[in-house]
Amino acid sequence: MPQNLPHFYRGRFSVAPMLDWTTRHCRYFHRQFSKHALLYTEMVTAPAIIHAKYDHLDFDLQENPVALQLGGSDPEQLKYCAKLAEERGYHEINLNVGCPSDRVQNGMFGACLMAKADLVADCVEQMQSAVKIPVTVKTRIGIDELDSYEFLCDFIEKVQGKGCQEFIIHARKAWLSGLSPKENREIPPLDYIRVYQLKRDFPHLTIAINGGIKTIEEMKQHLQYVDGVMVGREAYQNPSLLGQIDQALFDPNAPIVTAHEAVESMLPYIEQQLSQGIHLNHIVRHILGAFQNCKGARQWRRYLSENAFKQGAGIEVVETALSFVES
């Protein structure tokens, strides 16, 4: 008889929300590698959902579990969007309190909200009043000169006081001016110890860590101190990493999924999307890194890059590119 698996936190491993990257096509591809990974949408602002001319919440239920990341600071707008997302089948609502870009700040959401903990708490409270699925917060360890551990604890204390039980902490502070979003992911030093300390001081909360995590061994190390790990660019640029996640972090009997297997399992989805008028390039741009460090990877990338954008490009482009790499 198979042994029952231990119960793990839903977000024991997750792929970070990344603007322009974690689209629905990307998430469908990532799901081919892992049954258990929690996948996040790109950040979608509440006003965009409310006023948009097209459907920002569209996704395939086969992508689940998927969390919708919302940007905003109007409690009523966020409440409305959270309810919509739950009705559409999302598994979690996440509030962005970590993005430092100027555009995000001008909209009064993202990392600048760390200085407005009471407002964040009100937003969380309103969203939780409308849904039964978890409402979580993704944030930094500080902003600008507000970077003391006491400041972080005060923020967590106020937000959890209104019911938030799950936080994803990017283990860097954010500079709200002077650095680009890319620089804010690289220049402020990582401080994993501070996130570990947060879990020790708030043991009743669920804490996941994010920032600079690239290997299975690093993930296992972090999971000795926190409840979950979130990986961003490494998962996108080297998606084969995801094929190891289920076995390494959830079920030792789970198979390792190869990039070749994941791409082959994507083919019916690609054909379906093409039949609905989606251009091939919009899908395959997310699978270019599938065979990183594998023989034939360069030919795979080149063939897709040179042919997927062409008018009428079909599934045969992916099948031909796949023939360049070893299974």
From Swiss-Prot:
Which InterPro entries does the annotation name?
Aldolase_TIM, DUS-like_FMN-bd, DUS_fam, DusA, tRNA_hU_synthase_CS
Which residue positions does UniProt flag as site: Interacts with tRNA? 96, 182, 185, 298, 301
Q: What is the E.C. number?
A: 1.3.1.-, 1.3.1.91
**Main EC class of this protein?**
oxidoreductase
Classification via Pfam families = Dus
Q: Which UniProt keywords apply?
A: Flavoprotein, FMN, NADP, Oxidoreductase, RNA-binding, tRNA processing, tRNA-binding
Q: Enumerate the cofactors the protein uses.
A: FMN
Enumerate the active-site residues: 99 (proton donor)
* Gene Ontology molecular function: any one: FMN binding
Q: Which reaction does it catalyse?
A: 5,6-dihydrouridine(20) in tRNA + NADP(+) = uridine(20) in tRNA + NADPH + H(+); 5,6-dihydrouridine(20) in tRNA + NAD(+) = uridine(20) in tRNA + NADH + H(+); 5,6-dihydrouridine(20a) in tRNA + NADP(+) = uridine(20a) in tRNA + NADPH + H(+); 5,6-dihydrouridine(20a) in tRNA + NAD(+) = uridine(20a) in tRNA + NADH + H(+)
Q: Where does FMN bind?
A: 17-19, 69, 138, 170, 210-212, 232-233
The lineage's top-level taxon is Bacteria
The family annotation for this protein states: Belongs to the Dus family. DusA subfamily.
Function description: Catalyzes the synthesis of 5,6-dihydrouridine (D), a modified base found in the D-loop of most tRNAs, via the reduction of the C5-C6 double bond in target uridines. Specifically modifies U20 and U20a in tRNAs.
- Descriptive protein name: tRNA-dihydrouridine(20/20a) synthase
Gene responsible for this protein: dusA
